[in-house]
């Protein structure tokens, strides 16, 4: 299997991009009481339409689709609607690195102290597989770390923040996410916050269908699903 990068020159004119959950629903035939079981296998699903495509851009897309060989290979795409997070664009790496603290870590009598820049956002603690929240650090103190719906890349996988989260004065934030964490991750794993990507494969072998109208403009719609 080969993984391809998505060409920057190709942006969809219409897009569907969402997290498809995997649940089982049981309904009592007597009382209609319902039980729902969450199962593993939630995945990102996308449908992207490119219309119109000039001959050059149509060729670029058709070449990529041919290389993907149906569902065999994968391509890394992102949600074109949400390429950047809505939180405070500053991070602790923007804070001058000092010297701003005492060598013995002394704080003031009112409990305040200095904030020292600590780089870009990353995991502040390890997280187990299946976790629904991650502990992070490196945010701008007391700023909005992420907004609800912001996308986060972690270890090559894509997650969505389910709530708006404000960082603490120390620049830490616990962020609720979906889907559950795909794998256990170690402390200091960096967060991708700009165009976080997900590896996807074509749903079928017919995704390269390319109806063309007079004027040599081509329209192509592709369906993709996350490679789990």
Please provide the spans of the model-predicted regions.
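Extracellular/virion structural assembly segments
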Residues: 1-228
